[in-house]
């Protein structure tokens, strides 16, 4: 053991000598190889840019045999000359044609005809069509927004028979009757996060294209064209789009793709770090849509080619010498430090570790916090991981959470310290305020602000309280703001244990998110109580899939259900059965019978099986703020029976 550090140092010096001897030839040969590769890549890119970027795919439903069809296409580039190119196509089983050569999109069937078999308007004119921009040599990133709420009037088999695709949900820009609602169109406005890579500048973006997954021309009594404009951040993208296509709109979940060619876009007012507003604005006629794809085209970052170097005698520069010396010194220090840590860790593991004053965590004003400075009062909470006490520190009431001695070990201390460093940097009115901590065993604790009304769970289950809908919605708005702050932090903080027990309420009924930093630690060595965390956990996480922001949205939906019913989710069902029923069989709590319709619909959307179809927390906040709760009676607590 004592000879191990010296052996590591000898090996390190040997590797440094080898690297110095080989650096000359390697750098010289590598420079020549890199230059040759640059020349080859430039030639490849040059040839690639010469390719014409138009593609035509025709598939025919009328015949399953391979029929040789002729189709003539006149390209816009040859409009001054009567030049036609003849193409041959093999027909197959599908009838979808994405036809973009003339700057418009149409759906075609048969063996090459460009007329629309579903169109009720025989006029082939589509009005002025914006000229496409060149996207040669670009990459693209896509953001997708979804519409929902439309009443389904057909099954997926109808979509297959008619050659459509089947969507999960939809909304229309019009209604048939007030009782036959066509979803939450909301003037075609949706919000999306920037899909571009963080390294891409707005100046590298050349344009945007769109794909409407839906049906167009939905007002059969109107004979005019369907006229559409696309706006991002209230700025129109490209020109007005017109089409005479008319689809069968009776079945909203059945859709086709309506593709819009790339349009120029200068990203005026575009938000690279947050949400952006997109609007599908109908000027004439109407549509039904399941989703909208927003495709950004951008030039990748390029490195200018370097001139071919003239082979010269391989030499090593003075700068390289200094770099090698510097790296050697730094590497040596790292090895010495590593050896020290190795010896200290072995010393600690043998039972001789004694923490010192440096284990205190500094609070925000730069002063140490000592557990002996806090006057511990009555116990106000208890969990599997420890106990929470009401304390008095510097004349103010605080909450002190203590870890039990039997849970304390070196790994717990490291995780505890990491989470404290995260918590002390968070400042938001709807996030519990961290005051300080102590890491000296056995007094391992954190100190936070005291919330006199306790948890939201205790309020919902207080028989003496009658809660108004306006108050419940206000508290949910507070909770949404707190979670949004965590999701937008750097790095992103995923709560992972969002439930009514972890939403604390102050004397003014303001809700603050708590226990987002310690949930992983607190579960170690703990046994879940009846109806524990699985009741708030999303189905994909119960299936051991990746935890994302949408998992927190699902947990938020369960809390919305708790507020609407003042009951425990899955009451009386053991946790292991909840895991199977929710994760594998799609079980959900029953839909509440009383409450504002917008609130109930938001609750349902948050519990969607598909994470991508759940709203974001920003959308949850926006929808909560728009709810009118007037006219709904107060919610009373009703004891649940097994």
Swiss-Prot record:
It comes from Dictyostelium discoideum (Social amoeba). Residues 374-627 form the Protein kinase domain. The active site is at residue 497. One of its GO terms (molecular function) is protein kinase activity. Residues 1-23 form the signal peptide. Belongs to the protein kinase superfamily. TKL Ser/Thr protein kinase family. The keyword Zinc does not apply. Its main location: membrane. Residues 24-322 are extracellular. It holds the Pfam family PK_Tyr_Ser-Thr. This is Probable serine/threonine-protein kinase drkA. The gene is drkA.
């Amino acid at each position: 053991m004592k000879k191990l550090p010296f052996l590591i140092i000898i090996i390190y010096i040997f590797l440094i000598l080898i690297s110095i001897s080989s650096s000359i030839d390697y750098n010289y040969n590598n420079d020549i190889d890199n230059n040759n590769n640059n020349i080859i890549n430039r030639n490849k890119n040059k040839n690639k840019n010469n390719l014409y970027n138009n593609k035509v795919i025709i598939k025919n439903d009328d015949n399953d045999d391979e029929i040789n069809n002729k189709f003539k296409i006149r390209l816009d580039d040859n409009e001054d000359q009567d030049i036609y190119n003849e193409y041959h196509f093999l027909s197959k089983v599908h009838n979808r044609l994405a036809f973009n050569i003339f700057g418009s999109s149409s759906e075609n069937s048969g063996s090459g005809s460009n007329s629309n078999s579903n169109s009720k308007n025989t006029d082939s004119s589509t009005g002025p069509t914006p000229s496409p921009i060149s996207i040669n040599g670009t990459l693209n990133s896509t953001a997708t927004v979804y519409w929902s709420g439309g009443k389904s009037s057909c099954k997926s088999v109808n979509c297959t028979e008619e050659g459509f695709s089947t969507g999960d949900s939809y909304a229309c820009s019009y209604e048939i009757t007030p009782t036959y609602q066509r979803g939450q169109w909301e003037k075609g406005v949706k919000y999306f996060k920037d899909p571009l890579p963080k390294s891409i500048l707005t100046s590298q973006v050349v344009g945007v294209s769109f794909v409407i997954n839906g049906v167009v021309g939905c007002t059969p009594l109107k004979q005019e064209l369907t006229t559409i404009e696309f706006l991002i951040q209230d700025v129109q993208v490209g020109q007005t789009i017109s089409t005479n296509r008319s689809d069968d709109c009776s079945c909203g979940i059945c859709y086709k793709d309506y593709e819009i060619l790339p349009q120029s876009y200068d990203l005026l007012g575009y938000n690279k770090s947050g949400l952006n507003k997109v609007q599908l604005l109908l000027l004439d006629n109407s549509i039904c849509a399941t989703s909208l794809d927003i495709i950004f085209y951008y030039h990748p970052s390029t490195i200018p080619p370097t001139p071919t170097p003239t082979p010269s005698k391989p030499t090593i520069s003075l700068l390289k010498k200094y770099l090698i010396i510097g790296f050697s010194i730094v590497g040596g220090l790292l090895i010495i430090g590593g050896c020290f840590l190795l010896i200290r860790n072995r010393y600690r593991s043998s039972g001789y570790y004694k923490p010192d004053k440096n284990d205190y965590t500094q609070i925000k004003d730069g002063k140490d916090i000592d557990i002996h400075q806090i006057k511990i009062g009555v116990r106000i909470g208890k969990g599997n991981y420890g106990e929470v006490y009401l304390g008095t520190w510097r004349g103010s009431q605080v909450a002190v959470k203590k870890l039990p001695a039997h849970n304390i070990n070196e790994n717990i201390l490291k995780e505890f310290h990491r989470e404290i460093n995260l918590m002390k940097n968070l400042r938001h009115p709807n996030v519990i305020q961290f005051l300080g901590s102590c890491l000296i065993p056995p007094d391992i604790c954190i100190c936070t602000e005291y919330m006199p009304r306790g948890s939201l769970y205790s309020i919902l289950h207080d028989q003496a309280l009658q809660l108004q809908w306006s108050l419940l919605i206000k508290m949910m708005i507070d909770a949404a703001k707190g979670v949004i702050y965590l999701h937008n932090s750097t790095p992103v903080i995923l709560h992972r244990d969002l439930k009514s027990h972890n939403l604390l309420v102050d004397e003014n009924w303001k809700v603050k998110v708590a226990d987002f930093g310690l949930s992983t630690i607190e579960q170690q060595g703990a046994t879940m109580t009846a109806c524990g965390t699985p009741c708030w956990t999303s189905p994909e996480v119960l299936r051991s899939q990746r935890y994302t922001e949408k998992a927190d949205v699902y947990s938020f939906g369960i809390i919305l259900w708790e507020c609407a019913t003042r009951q425990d989710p899955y009451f009386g069902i053991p946790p292991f059965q909840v895991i199977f029923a929710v994760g594998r069989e799609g079980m959900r709590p029953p839909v509440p019978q009383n409450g504002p319709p917008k609130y109930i619909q938001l609750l349902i959307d948050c519990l969607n099986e598909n994470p991508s179809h759940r709203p974001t927390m920003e959308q949850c906040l926006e929808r909560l703020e728009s709810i009118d709760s007037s006219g709904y009676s107060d919610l009373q607590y009703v004891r649940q029976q097994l």
